[in-house]
Amino acid sequence: MSNLENFRAQVSEWLEENCPPSMRTPMVEDEVVWGGRNAVYKNPESKIWLDKMGEKGWTAPALPKEYGGGGLNSDEIKILNSELFKIGARPALNSFGIWMLAPVIIEYGNEAQKMEHIPKILKGEIRWCQGYSEPGSGSDLASLSTKAEDMGCLLYTSDAADE
């Protein structure tokens, strides 16, 4: 048995033992787990599933183990996703922190920032969001506008020279 076949067998066995039955059903809108300090779990098995996946590092399988991720390579992640799909498992955590913030902290944060924030994000203990605010538009990104002025071989967009 190859390493990947062995990994698939281990994942399948772990999921069979640890994924609660109600987490193998289609997602119910009010049961989506966003995490955070004041998270409410309408389905108690959602919290169990989050805790188990968080302990395993599989809420963010590609992130390094030392920060609470799974430390998996791309082939292992494909297998994990395939096995999750096979049993119809719901995502344990929907988190902008995982998708948007954790990769930035991994890339640009210092060690203290990584250790402080990433494990809490991956376990759903804290919740992050991203806000946009633009002059004349506020947070309505659909109303953004810009203009450009042809300067010969250069093209300047509005406010670009001020940066």
Locations of regions flagged by a protein language model:
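A short, Trp-centered hydrophobic/proline-enriched beta-strand micro-motif
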Residues: G124-Y132
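Amphipathic, small/basic residue-rich leader segments at the start of a protein or domain
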Residues: M1-F96, A112-K123
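Active-site-adjacent elements of ketosynthase-type condensing enzymes
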Residues: G136-L144
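A structural signal for short hydrophobic beta-strand segments in well-ordered beta-sheet cores
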Residues: T146-E149
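Short, solvent-exposed loop/turn elements at beta->coil junctions and helix N-caps
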Residues: E66, S133-S137
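Conserved small/polar residues in nucleotide/adenosyl-binding loops
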Residues: Y156-E163
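N-terminal glycine-rich flavin-associated loop
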Residues: L93-A112, G138
